[in-house]
C-alpha cells in the first residue's frame, strides 16, 4: 500500500496488524482517483471510517486543502497519525463514532465512505450526510462497498 502520486508519491503506508480491516488496493485507489483527479486540489476532505487513512492521505498528497480522518478504533487512529507523519502531511484525526461525528461537523467538498462491509453503516452514513447537509455544493461522495450491493437511493439534488 503506497501513495500513488503528489507530494508524498511512492511513500509506503503502514498497514494494520491484526485489525479487522480491508485496505483499498492500490489498483482500485488509482482508478478511483483518476476519476476525481480534477476535483481534489484545494478541497476539504473527510475520510470517514479512515482505517489506515490512505484515501485522505492520497487526497492531501494531490493538493487537498485539508483532511479530517475519523475512526472509532484507537489502533486505526494511531495508524493514521503514523502514516500522516511518514508522508509529512497534516490532517485532523478524530477518534470517535463516525455517525456521531456527522451530526456536528462542517461541510466537506470530498467525502470518502469506506465502512466495514455488511454492517449497514454505508447506508446510515449516506443518510446522515444528506440529513445534516454535510456535502458542499458541487461536492463528491466516494463510497466503497461490495460489488453485489445494491446502490442506495438518494434524494435530489444528490445522485450516484
Where are these regions (language model features)?
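Class I S-adenosyl-L-methionine-dependent methyltransferase catalytic core
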Residues: 1-160
Amino acid at each position: 500500500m503506497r501513495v500513488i502520486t503528489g507530494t508524498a508519491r511512492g511513500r509506503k503506508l503502514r498497514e494494520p496488524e491484526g485489525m479487522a480491516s480491508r485496505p483499498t488496493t492500490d489498483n482500485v485507489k488509482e482508478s478511483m482517483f483518476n476519476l476525481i483527479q480534477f476535483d481534489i486540489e484545494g478541497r476539504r476532505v473527510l475520510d470517514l471510517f479512515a482505517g489506515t487513512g490512505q484515501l485522505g492521505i492520497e487526497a492531501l498528497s494531490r493538493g487537498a486543502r485539508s483532511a479530517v480522518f475519523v475512526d472509532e478504533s484507537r489502533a486505526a487512529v494511531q495508524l493514521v497519525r503514523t502514516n500522516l507523519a511518514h508522508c509529512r502531511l497534516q490532517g485532523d484525526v478524530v477518534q470517535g463514532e463516525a455517525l456521531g461525528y456527522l451530526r456536528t461537523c462542517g461541510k466537506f467538498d470530498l467525502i470518502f465512505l469506506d465502512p466495514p462491509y455488511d454492517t449497514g453503516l454505508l447506508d446510515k452514513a449516506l443518510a446522515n450526510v444528506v440529513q445534516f447537509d454535510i456535502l458542499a455544493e458541487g461536492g463528491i461522495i466516494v463510497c466503497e462497498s461490495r460489488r453485489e450491493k445494491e446502490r442506495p437511493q438518494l434524494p435530489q439534488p444528490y445522485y450516484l
